[in-house]
């Protein structure tokens, strides 16, 4: 057993944290769940990669897709081909009822990050595929508006493309507003997640440090993402928010 697997097994069994694996590749998911993962994330790029990389396995599901589909309808069919499969695979974990476990993420159109109404309607479609699907949308102004509306509808939602404390704070506030509206309308609130792309922040700062010839040690650079995650966590705790922080993009 390598050190990475030892860490993941310790992390998933000896801490209160949970982890999801960011991939749609079957071999990677099998290894991740064998080492304590309880959920997974996908995006359009990852779905396309796994379909292209394992055509033999997906052939049956792909053959069931009508050949005359175009535009969004074709995209939905391809996404459902993969996320629907994984939603079935993780359903037994989901049905145990442990918060944050047994979910699969499906992402809204990354080319529509400024169109709240489009994302809301797309989220309804993605969420209809299975009760354990979490809809990912960006932490842009439009995305946070859509996030609140989806939370008010009782959908499971995650705000991604988020790198800063203010973004997490805005997501936490939107989650609280949306869930309160759901309760007022007799709707059971879903899971609300605030993704924090720590690794991407580190990547940016690494490039800045190199460009400015600062000579910073790698351990100093990677403290930035950790600091943002800690600060965000404490703020959400002070707000008594039940939104889950998901550090992501880890290297």
Task: Report residues per predicted region.
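N- or domain-start disorder-to-order transition segments that initiate the globular core
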Residues: 1-31
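Short, surface-exposed connector motifs at secondary-structure boundaries
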Residues: 13, 127-133, 149-158, 235-243
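Hydrophobic faces of well-ordered beta-strands that scaffold small-molecule active sites
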Residues: 17-23, 38-42, 77, 102-108, ...
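Active-site-proximal loop/turn and secondary-structure-junction residues that shape catalytic pockets
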Residues: 25, 44-46, 102, 108-112, ...
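Catalytic cores of alpha/beta
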Residues: 26-34, 145-146, 168-176
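Glycine-enriched alpha-helix->loop->beta-strand junction motifs that scaffold or abut catalytic
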Residues: 35-39, 130-131, 146-158, 176, ...
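Active-site beta->alpha loop and helix N-cap motifs at the rims of alpha/beta catalytic domains
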Residues: 37, 46-49, 53-142, 146
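Catalytic alpha/beta core domains of metabolic enzymes, predominantly
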Residues: 156-251
């Amino acid at each position: 057993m390598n050190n990475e697997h030892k860490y993941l097994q310790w992390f998933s069994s000896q801490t209160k944290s949970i982890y999801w694996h960011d991939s749609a590749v079957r071999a990677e998911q099998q290894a991740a769940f064998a080492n304590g993962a309880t959920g997974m994330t996908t995006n359009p790029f990852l779905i396309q990669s796994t379909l292209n990389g394992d055509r033999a396995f997906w052939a049956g599901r792909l053959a069931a897709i009508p050949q005359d589909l175009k535009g969004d309808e074709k995209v939905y069919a391809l996404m459902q081909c993969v996320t629907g499969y994984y939603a079935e695979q993780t359903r037994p974990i989901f049905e145990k009822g442990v918060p944050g476990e047994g979910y699969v993420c499906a992402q809204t159109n990354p080319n529509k990050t400024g169109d709240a109404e489009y994302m809301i309607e797309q989220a309804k479609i993605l969420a209809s595929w299975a009760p354990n699907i979490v809809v990912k949308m960006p932490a842009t102004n439009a995305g946070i508006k859509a996030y609140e509306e989806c939370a008010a509808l009782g959908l499971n939602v995650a705000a991604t493309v988020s790198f800063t404390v203010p973004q997490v704070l805005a997501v936490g506030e939107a989650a609280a507003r949306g869930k309160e509206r759901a309760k007022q309308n007799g709707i059971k609130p879903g899971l609300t997640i605030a993704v924090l792309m720590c690794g991407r922040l580190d990547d940016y700062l690494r490039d800045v440090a190199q460009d400015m010839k600062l000579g910073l040690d790698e351990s100093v650079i990677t403290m930035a993402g950790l600091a943002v995650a800690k600060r965000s966590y404490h703020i959400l705790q002070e707000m008594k928010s039940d939104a889950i922080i998901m550090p992501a993009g880890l290297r």
